[in-house]
Amino acid sequence: MGIDINHKYDRKVRRTEPKSQDVYLRLLVKLYRFLQRRTNKKFNRIILKRLFMSKINRPPLSLQRIARFFKAANQPESTIVVVGTVTDDARLLVVPKLTVCALHVTQTARERILKAGGEVLTFDQLALRSPTGKNTLLLQGRRTARTACKHFGKAPGVPHSHTRPYVRSKGRKFERARGRRSSCGYKK
């Protein structure tokens, strides 16, 4: 008598295609599937995987951070690749000459990059220019930077917790007494 094997946990949970029905995104997936198969390079595998990702996992990257990473990398000829959005940062006064490839670049960021003598590429242009990912700098934004992530972690109020509490309102009466002032219990 055979053993009845439980196949309950057999499914591997990972995206094999993007959820979006955007035809342009799906064309890029088709292109990078081909490149990943034919070149067998890690760069193309990472790009393909990131094209599948949800918007939460493709956080935006500001020009300020791009400029900082670019300077630290010390590779003036490299192309910066971001599978996501590149946004402008008004606090950055001087934009260096950059070659940026991204899914989306905001209008002001694009203007500033072009004004500095740089260029903005699409992923199909990058595939022609650098099919193996040679001379590129692959960057991504901070996934934990969004406001929702500030609520995750140790419970608010416990020692050494910097977690933001879920509060109905930010008024005088809400989470402003015990632990916040010495007249009510203690001051943290």
Swiss-Prot record:
Its main location: cytoplasm. It is found in: Cytoplasm. InterPro entries: Ribosomal_eL18, Ribosomal_eL18/eL18-A/B/_CS, Ribosomal_uL15/eL18, Ribosomal_uL15/eL18_sf. One of its GO terms (biological process) is cytoplasmic translation. It comes from the Eukaryota. GO terms for molecular function: RNA binding; structural constituent of ribosome. One of its GO terms (cellular component) is cytosolic ribosome. Keywords: Cytoplasm, Ribonucleoprotein, Ribosomal protein. Belongs to the eukaryotic ribosomal protein eL18 family. This is Large ribosomal subunit protein eL18. It comes from Drosophila melanogaster (Fruit fly). The gene is RpL18.
